[in-house]
Amino acid sequence: MKKLFSVKLSKSKVILVAACLLLAGSGTAYAAHELTKQSVSVSINGKKKHIRTHANTVGDLLETLDIKTRDEDKITPAKQTKITADMDVVYEAAKPVKLTINGEEKTLWSTAKTVGALLDEQDVDVKEQDQIDPAIDTDISKDMKINIEPAFQVTVNDAGKQKKIWTTSTTVADFLKQQKMNIKDEDKIKPALDAKLTKGKADITITRIEKVTDVVEEKIAFDVKKQEDASLEKGKEKVVQKGKEGKLKKHFEVVKENGKEVSRELVKEETAEQSKDKVIAVGTKQSSPKFETVSASGDSKTVVSRSNESTGKVMTVSSTAYTASCSGCSGHTATGVNLKNNPNAKVIAVDPNVIPLGSKVHVEGYGYAIAADTGSAIKGNKIDVFFPEKSSAYRWGNKTVKIKILN
């Protein structure tokens, strides 16, 4: 009985020892397994942690962390790199971004931090005039939408001055607003404001319209009125009242295109100053006339009797008028009369072959005079009567008159 108990006890010890040995072996194996792991620092999308791993490569490590990678992801070092002790592994997941350029959309995956970095990464060439939304310094986020409207050049002819301007505007109206161009309602824009602008079809012509009022002052000619004067010898005239020109203001609406006048319309007239008639007294007194002639010195006077009038020769001649200051005139007659010093002298120019110089005559509508001058254009039955004023000479004009030679 004692022997049997000993045997049983021995078996229990054996089992206990075996169990202890098994536990010891397992612990040793576990310890050995843990001791063979590599210590690695992993940064996942900016979050760092330290792990121990049996992974052979960086790719294996990411798989053990249940990270599904894409070609666009940023992994440092590369996935095929062997794991070493105290290795730093950085993983940045690419984000999906929708990029639209000039209306064409495509989806990209990128680890770029900002819009500008993404465009550089994708080799998208942009100009400072391009419209980029959001701005290039905006941080990239998942499913972000980026829109780029490339700028193009518009040729603007503004009042004849041409310049090229970069823009992303799609219509003429939007372009003018974007450029803050001062356009008046009267200005002409070509093409129309709602016309589309596209690359290669972007020419704008601006015609500047200006409306101004132009006031022009004109002279109003005075009338000449003659009145009979019984106290004045017949054939003589005397200025009773000098004429004075009036002033007329004409208001014109002037339209200019690019500074050049294209139309003018009279909109108003107003008299600024009334004209004043010239009044001439015409003698009607019947008496023996005195004829004043001037010698070559321009000073002496001669009195001629009217008795020759009844026997004088009457002729019909063409007549014109002149003054002392007419073109080509010296102020002195062919017989030496100084007309400038004797403005009231009654003198006519004649053809000496028809009417001798020095003859006393009576000219219809002019009165008594002396044939004291000649002229290169005075040939045959033609005379030129002298007036001290141009206005009187102009009024005489060119007419046919009767002349009586008194001596």
Curated annotation (Swiss-Prot):
Induction: Negatively regulated by an overlapping cis-acting antisense RNA which itself is positively regulated by extracytoplasmic sigma factors SigM and SigX; when both sigma factors are deleted expression of the yabE mRNA is detected.
Limits of the G5 domain: 206-286
This protein's record includes keyword Signal: yes
GO molecular function: hydrolase activity, hydrolyzing O-glycosyl compounds
Highest taxon listed in the record's lineage: Bacteria
InterPro entries registered for this protein in UniProt: 3D_dom, DUF348, G5_dom, Resuscitation_pf_RpfB, RlpA-like_sf
Protein task: Suggested to be involved in cell wall modification.
Name of the protein: Putative cell wall shaping protein YabE
Lineage: Bacteria, Bacillati, Bacillota, Bacilli, Bacillales
